[in-house]
């Protein structure tokens, strides 16, 4: 049941429900007070029923001890306690019978405390067992009466009434007045609260408390000293008579100053000798006072020592750590460079902690939500611009930033060592680093190679972490660096829950590796990845758009063979054919068209592949697209002419017209045409060409202006002459696209398949077979533990019916294509050594059937032999069709067949 938000009143309302025996608690999570004091408020107990007790609605006329107005009342009483703390000992020692203004002030103060006694009967208290506010009036009264009620009442009795109650011999001592010092417990509670209040300095609160304790002790002692001298029968035999023989006639101020002087010299154990105890009573009191001073001095010195030591403890620990590190380095004879790195790192750590730059312990004590918000505020923009995370969702970046740790490193410090195990990678926030490649593990100037430099916003160590291989370089800081460290396990855990973003990260990494052609070690990693892609060992959603953007026709061919949708688009809405046409990659365009890519596909900006090829002068690609039925009418044809006008390209304008472009339509939202643009630019040549191709000189824009009117307003005489002399040409009609049935695949050039050449394929097959033979379990383990292995396994799980997360560009279309299409075709070379022809038997390239039985039946029909087994070229038996890969060479044999090497061995 929802409740309304309300503040706890000083005295709870009198409306309805009075007299209830039980505490009615209406709790709500919206009642949380922003003023809640963590030093005095009641914390809720654990469990679903434990929240909100401190915000309970109390009974009628019951005051919450945490109400702001009650706290102000207590703070006001503190001022009266300070008055009582000074006046009570003073009256006890110097004023036998208070009268006049002093007596009136005492009675006024007593009246305030009497009001507080009455109010206390209506103040709820915290139960020490349940830590809940108890608002039962009877329990409140019983608790108060059995604890501090008697002392509070006695301390409030007026002085005049107390003198009448006491016997005549004790009336002058004001014993009841001394009981008012009981109120000092309120000051102790105040200091305890201030010590926990973050608005006040703990150091100064403690200092003020110690000063107050010292002054109060000196003041009380001075008053007691004077009381002993004043009440002693022989005034000349007292401590004050040596300094002031007729002290009774001196002013009260002079007597008080003298008493304070002797009290403070005794407390400080100075003892100049001008004042000292004269009688037995003074000696006994002085002895007792000095014993008290021993404890008070120890208390003050101990507290001051703790305060001072606390401020210097960090420096002491730092010096001890530096000394220990230096001793360790010297004891084990470490190189000077390592010693310097150790000392620099420890010094930098001390400085960052002392200046509040890297309070790791404080940061770790915060809840995860607060830590994530802090990291997001500090580093989100930087991580968003890292090349590895270009194009990923903000959700992934937020998750990654939450797992990153900021660290400082001194100059010339090694962050990553070459060939060490990949555990973390780093993003540079500030500073710079150098990447060093060692030869044979020797660090000498003659064998060091500077592989590159890294600056703010760059990543180091990501290749080793993502590919799960030893680090390629040693990363060493050149200046003071602030780095973001990300653990490999945390990164892969996040990627597993964001497969679509993981694919983007993987593509970004592959693109980066391929661009770094000047570094041999990175080139080797890129080649290894390409080989694994070619062998089909990576089952993750690399898109056709990625392959087309890299111009990798072999990878594109492999992906198309797996059944990927040739019309899938990236996150910008561009298909692979758009990208291949824009890059002028004839081989990729041919492959896509052969596999059913739409030659007239349109991106969100209205561009078609033919336009991408035309505007970049890729004539061979243009011809391929035209032969496949492409034209410009499928896109936003009008803006094409405007581009030609702006570029002053008559040849491009002619191509636009020839391929079905529109030169007369509006090319922008304001209704302007390409002819408007030519007139505004004063380009008479382009205007004449447009008019020749059917542009309308009287087409109006949204303002009602025609190209002819614009020419007249601008006073372009040549332009007006062109309009006047131009004859009206009928617009050339765009060539209609051929029907779908008339579109045939692009013919093979010279009868050669447009997939990667057979020689190249054979070379790749042989090389990959050799590489596969050399593969070791360690390399396969590296692959499984790398980013590629994580994406592969996750993609396989999704493909088999597991969780289907969002894909990258065209992921949904590819998923539908995979679910509706048959398994990818596998081509194998088969031969039968037992057929006629002997060892010179010919091989035949066939599509692999779904079962081995089907393959044996196919071989029987081709070779005229009834084979019963399938073996590899190396003589290994094949028991399952799923073991066969594209490009394998298989032998179809009978049970009687013996491999040639075994036959020669038997002979």
UniProtKB/Swiss-Prot annotation:
ANK repeats lie at residues 539-568, 572-601, 605-634, 636-665, 670-699. Residues 754-776 have a biased composition (Low complexity). Residues 827-907 form the KHA domain. This is Potassium channel AKT3. Residues 803-812 have a biased composition (Gly residues). Disulfide bonds: none annotated. Keywords: ANK repeat, Ion channel, Ion transport, Membrane, Potassium, Potassium channel, Potassium transport, Repeat, Transmembrane, Transmembrane helix, Transport, Voltage-gated channel. It comes from Oryza sativa subsp. japonica (Rice). GO terms for molecular function: voltage-gated potassium channel activity. Residues 1-75, 124-146, 196-209, 310-907 are cytoplasmic. Belongs to the potassium channel family. Plant (TC 1.A.1.4) subfamily. The chain crosses the membrane at residues 76-96, 103-123, 147-167, 175-195, 210-230, 289-309. The segment S4 is probably the voltage-sensor and is characterized by a series of positively charged amino acids. The pore-forming region H5 is enclosed by the transmembrane segments S5 and S6 in the Shaker-type (1P/6TM) and contains the GYGD signature motif which seems to be involved in potassium selectivity. The KHA domain (rich in hydrophobic and acidic residues) present in the C-terminal part is likely to be important for tetramerization. Residues 726-779, 801-824 are annotated as: Disordered. Residues 258-277 dip into the membrane without crossing it. SMART domains: ANK, cNMP. Residues 97-102, 168-174, 231-257, 278-288 are extracellular. PANTHER family: POTASSIUM CHANNEL AKT1, POTASSIUM CHANNEL AKT3. It is found in: Membrane. Pfam families: Ank_2, cNMP_binding, Ion_trans, KHA. It comes from the Eukaryota.
């Amino acid at each position: 049941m929802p409740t309304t938000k309300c503040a706890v009143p000083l005295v709870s309302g009198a409306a309805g429900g009075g007299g209830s025996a039980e505490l009615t608690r209406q709790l709500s999570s919206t009642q949380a007070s922003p003023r809640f004091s963590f030093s005095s408020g009641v914390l809720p107990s654990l469990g679903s029923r434990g929240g909100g007790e401190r915000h309970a609605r109390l009974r009628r006329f019951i005051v919450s001890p945490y109400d702001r107005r009650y706290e102000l009342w207590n703070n006001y009483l503190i001022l009266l306690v300070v008055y009582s703390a000074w006046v009570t000992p003073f009256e006890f020692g110097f004023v036998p019978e208070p009268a006049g203004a002093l007596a009136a002030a005492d009675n006024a103060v007593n009246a305030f405390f009497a009001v507080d006694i009455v109010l206390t009967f209506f103040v709820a208290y915290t139960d020490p067992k349940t830590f809940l506010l108890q608002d039962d009036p009877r329990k409140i009264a019983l608790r108060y009466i059995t604890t501090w009620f008697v002392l509070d009442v006695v301390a409030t009795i007026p002085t005049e009434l107390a003198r009448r109650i006491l016997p005549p011999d004790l009336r002058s001592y004001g014993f009841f007045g001394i009981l008012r010092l009981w109120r000092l417990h309120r000051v102790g509670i105040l200091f305890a609260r201030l010590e926990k209040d973050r608005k006040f300095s703990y150091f100064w609160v403690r200092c003020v408390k110690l000063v107050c304790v010292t002054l109060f002790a000196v003041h009380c002692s001075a008053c007691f000293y004077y009381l002993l001298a004043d009440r002693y029968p022989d005034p000349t035999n007292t401590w004050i008579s040596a300094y002031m023989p007729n002290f009774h006639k001196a002013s009260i101020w002079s007597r008080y100053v003298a008493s304070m002087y002797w009290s403070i010299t005794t407390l400080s154990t100075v003892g100049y000798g001008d004042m000292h105890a004269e009688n037995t009573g003074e000696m006994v009191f002085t002895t007792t006072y000095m014993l008290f001073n021993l404890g008070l001095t120890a208390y003050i010195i101990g507290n001051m020592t703790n305060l001072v030591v606390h401020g210097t403890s960090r420096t002491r620990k730092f010096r001890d750590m530096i000394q220990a590190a230096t001793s360790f380095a010297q004891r084990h004879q470490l190189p000077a460079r390592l010693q310097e790195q150790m000392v620099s790192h420890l010094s930098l750590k001390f400085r960052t902690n002392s200046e509040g730059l890297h309070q790791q312990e404080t940061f770790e004590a915060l809840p995860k939500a607060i830590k994530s918000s802090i990291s997001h505020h500090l580093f989100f923009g930087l991580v968003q611009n890292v090349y590895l995370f270009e194009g990923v969702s903000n959700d992934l970046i937020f998750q990654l930033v939450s797992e990153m740790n900021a660290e400082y490193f001194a100059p010339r410090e090694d962050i990553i060592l070459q060939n060490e195990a990949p555990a973390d990678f780093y993003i540079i926030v500030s500073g710079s680093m150098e990447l060093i490649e060692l030869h044979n593990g020797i660090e000498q100037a003659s064998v060091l190679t500077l592989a590159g430099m890294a600056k703010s916003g760059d990543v180091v160590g990501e290749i080793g972490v993502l590919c799960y291989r030893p680090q390629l370089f040693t990363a060493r800081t050149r200046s003071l660096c602030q780095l973001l460290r990300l653990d490999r396990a945390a990164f892969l855990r996040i990627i597993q829950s964001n497969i679509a973003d993981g694919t983007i990260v993987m593509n970004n990494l592959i693109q980066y590796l391929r661009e770094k052609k000047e570094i041999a070690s990175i080139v080797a990693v890129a080649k290894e990845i390409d080989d694994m892609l070619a062998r089909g060992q990576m089952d993750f959603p690399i898109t056709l758009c990625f392959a087309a953007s890299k111009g990798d026709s072999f990878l594109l061919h492999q992906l198309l063979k797996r059944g990927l949708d040739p019309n899938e688009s990236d996150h910008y809405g561009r298909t692979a054919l758009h990208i291949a046409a824009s890059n002028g990659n004839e081989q990729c365009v041919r492959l896509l068209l052969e596999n059913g890519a739409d030659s007239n596909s349109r991106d969100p900006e209205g561009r078609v592949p033919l336009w991408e090829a035309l505007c970049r002068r890729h004539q061979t690609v243009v011809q391929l697209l035209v032969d496949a039925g492409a034209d410009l009418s499928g896109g936003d044809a009008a803006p094409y002419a405007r581009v030609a006008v702006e570029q002053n390209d008559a040849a491009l304008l002619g191509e636009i017209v020839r391929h079905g472009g529109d030169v007369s339509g509006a090319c922008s939202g304001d209704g302007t045409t390409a002819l408007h643009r030519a007139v505004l630019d004063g380009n008479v040549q382009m205007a004449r060409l447009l008019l020749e191709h059917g542009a309308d000189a009287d087409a109006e824009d949204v303002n009602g202006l025609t190209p002819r009117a614009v020419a007249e307003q601008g006073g372009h005489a040549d332009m007006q002459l062109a309009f006047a002399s131009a004859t009206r040409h009928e617009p050339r009609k765009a060539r209609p696209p051929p029907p779908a049935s008339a579109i045939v695949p692009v013919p093979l050039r010279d009868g050669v398949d447009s997939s990667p050449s057979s020689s190249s394929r054979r070379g790749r097959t042989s090389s990959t077979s050799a590489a596969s033979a050399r593969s070791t379990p360690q390399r396969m383990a590296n692959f499984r533990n790398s980013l590629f292995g994580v994406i592969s396994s996750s993609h396989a799980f999704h493909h088999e019916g597991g969780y289907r997360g969002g894909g990258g560009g065209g992921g949904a279309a590819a998923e539908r294509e995979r679910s509706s299409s048959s398994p990818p075709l596998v081509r194998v070379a088969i031969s039968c050594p037992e057929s006629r022809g002997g060892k010179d038997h010919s091989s035949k390239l066939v599509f692999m059937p779904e079962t081995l039985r089907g393959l044996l039946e196919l071989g029987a029909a081709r070779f005229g032999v009834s084979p019963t087994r399938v073996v590899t070229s190396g003589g290994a038996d094949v028991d399952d069709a799923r073991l066969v890969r594209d490009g394998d060479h298989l032998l179809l044999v009978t049970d009687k067949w013996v491999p040639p090497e075994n036959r020669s061995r038997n002979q």
